[in-house]
UniProtKB/Swiss-Prot annotation:
Biased composition (Basic residues): 354-370
Protein origin, superkingdom: Viruses
Compositional bias segments (type: Basic and acidic residues): 342-353
Ranges annotated as spanning the membrane: none
Record-given protein name: Putative replication factor C small subunit L478
Residues where ATP binds: 41-48
InterPro entries recorded: DNA_pol3_clamp-load_cplx_C (IPR008921), DNA_Rep/Repair_Clamp_Loader (IPR050238), P-loop_NTPase (IPR027417)
Region feature Disordered, mapped onto this chain: 342-370
Family the entry assigns: Belongs to the activator 1 small subunits family. RfcS subfamily.
UniProt keywords, alphabetically: ATP-binding, DNA replication, Nucleotide-binding
Organism: Acanthamoeba polyphaga mimivirus (APMV)
PANTHER family listed in its UniProt record: REPLICATION FACTOR C / DNA POLYMERASE III GAMMA-TAU SUBUNIT, REPLICATION FACTOR C SUBUNIT 3
GO function term, MF aspect, one: DNA clamp loader activity
């Protein structure tokens, strides 16, 4: 068993960060009138663990006993059978950013809300809970349909929605929910968890090992635990996927050398297809590329234009287009920007200029004194 599964918090007292959000959820669950809830935060911030504890506060530990149930979905022209995880008290739905999500949500929620369970009265709750993960994957029409469905079944159901990016959720849907924004853990929190797991697993970490984990985890606790797991197994934490992203970034930067652009673009497309088959979302691919490119390009104007290309591509992705089309639009825009500015000197922001100006003045004073 992987460490991040083995050491997942079993009790609320085991949760070491974002304890203020946990206290607010516990207080909210103690009231009779529980609102719809949105929990938003980046990957690795503990959103799923918070949802688990919230369900235990609402009902009891029986919510962790899950089983699969099949639902028949009738779309506009197709019929599907989908397996959904559920307990006696709640159901878990994960949208897949397809055109069928609207019908999946409507049909599953309708069938689940109509099904009465007498076990629910043990907890004195008059409602069941519907948990929806990755709600930002829903298109605008699906989110509008979900809002209408929430209003229809408000007496018998409560909705807990989880997302990475709150800005992708339409305002009419957000206005009907109580929102909790969950930040990433601090380096101190991650260091505490890593030291605890290393002690329990008898893994000896020196200062360089700890520094490597903390510097490369990007404040993502799951990534840090994965690095520790690889250290315990004496294997490299960097997988082929990371190498594929690095190859794409190197190929994009190579266009500044004046080499064959068409060959570079074909190499990039091959690596992007290799990344896409791992089932990573297009928006996540663009975000990773933006982060890696900005770290390597020392020009504030180019970096600003890269972010603009990324925002346009990510906006188009939310409208249900093919991921590869918008990813290639982003990459082509970045390559065009680099080619047009390859002979220009890098431009700095005002803060950077002021810092360099101060350094030059202090150096000149030293030379005068000498």
């Amino acid at each position: 068993m992987f460490f991040f599964e083995k050491y997942r918090p079993k009790k609320p007292s085991d949760f070491l960060f974002n304890t203020d959000v946990l206290r607010q959820l516990k207080y909210l669950a103690s009231n009779e009138d529980v609102p719809h809830i949105i929990i938003s935060g980046p990957s690795g911030s503990g959103k799923k663990t918070l949802v688990k504890f919230l369900l235990e506060f609402l009902y009891d530990e029986d919510v962790n006993i899950l089983r699969k149930r099949k639902y028949n979905i009738n779309g506009s022209s197709t019929k599907k059978e989908i397996e959904i995880l559920q307990s006696n008290y709640h159901i878990i739905i994960e949208p897949t950013s397809t055109n069928h999500d609207k019908y999946i949500l409507q049909e599953i929620i309708k069938q689940y809300a109509m099904h009465k369970s007498f076990d629910i009265f043990k907890t004195k709750r008059k409602f069941k809970t519907i948990v929806i993960h990755n709600i930002e994957n829903l298109a605008n029409n699906s989110q509008a349909a979900l809002r209408r469905t929430m209003e229809r079944y408000a007496k018998t159901c409560r909705f807990i929605m989880v997302c990475n990016n709150l800005s992708k959720i339409m305002d009419p849907l957000r206005s009907r929910c109580r929102t909790f924004c969950v930040p990433l853990p601090t380096i101190e929190n991650i260091n505490t968890v890593v030291d605890y797991i290393a002690f329990m697993e008898n893994i000896k970490l020196n200062k360089n090992d700890t520094k490597f984990i903390l510097d490369n985890c990007n404040n993502n606790l799951k990534t840090a635990i994965w690095f520790l797991n690889c250290k315990g197994l004496n294997c490299s934490p960097f997988i082929a996927l990371d190498e594929a992203f690095d190859l794409v970034v190197e190929s994009i930067l190579e266009c500044r050398t004046g080499k064959n652009i068409f060959k570079i673009h074909n190499d990039i497309r091959t690596n992007i297809y290799n990344i896409l088959i791992t089932n990573i979302k297009g928006s996540e691919i663009i975000n990773i590329l933006v982060d890696k490119l900005i770290r390597k390009i020392d020009d504030d104007v180019i970096n600003m234009n890269i972010i603009q290309y990324a925002s346009k591509a990510e906006y188009n992705l939310t409208h249900g287009r093919r991921d590869i089309t918008d990813i290639e639009y982003f990459i082509s825009g970045v390559m065009q920007e680099l080619v047009l500015n390859r002979n220009k000197e890098p431009e700095k922001s005002e803060k950077t200029k002021s810092k360099t100006g101060k350094l030059s003045r202090t150096n000149s004073k030293k030379t005068i004194k000498n």
